[in-house]
Amino acid sequence: MKRTYQPSVTRRKRTHGFRVRMKTRGGRAVINARRAKGRKRLAI
């Protein structure tokens, strides 16, 4: 049985990237929460 995490830069950006986050209201809320917390990386 193979491991579940098979890294792919493309898939990572498409599902968790900054532009994807900005598309939905919830995603923008995530970005704002991370900004308020002072995260160095807002999105992957």
Curated annotation (Swiss-Prot):
One GO molecular-function entry: structural constituent of ribosome
- Gene3D superfamilies recorded: 1.10.287.3980
Pfam families, sorted: Ribosomal_L34
Kindly state a single biological-process term from the GO annotations of this entry: translation
Q: Which GO terms describe its cellular component?
A: ribonucleoprotein complex; ribosome
Question: Could you tell me the superkingdom of the organism this chain comes from?
Answer: Bacteria
Entry keywords, A to Z: Ribonucleoprotein, Ribosomal protein
Q: Which family does it belong to?
A: Belongs to the bacterial ribosomal protein bL34 family.
Q: What is this protein called?
A: Large ribosomal subunit protein bL34
Organismal lineage: Bacteria, Pseudomonadati, Pseudomonadota, Betaproteobacteria, Burkholderiales
Q: Which gene encodes it?
A: rpmH
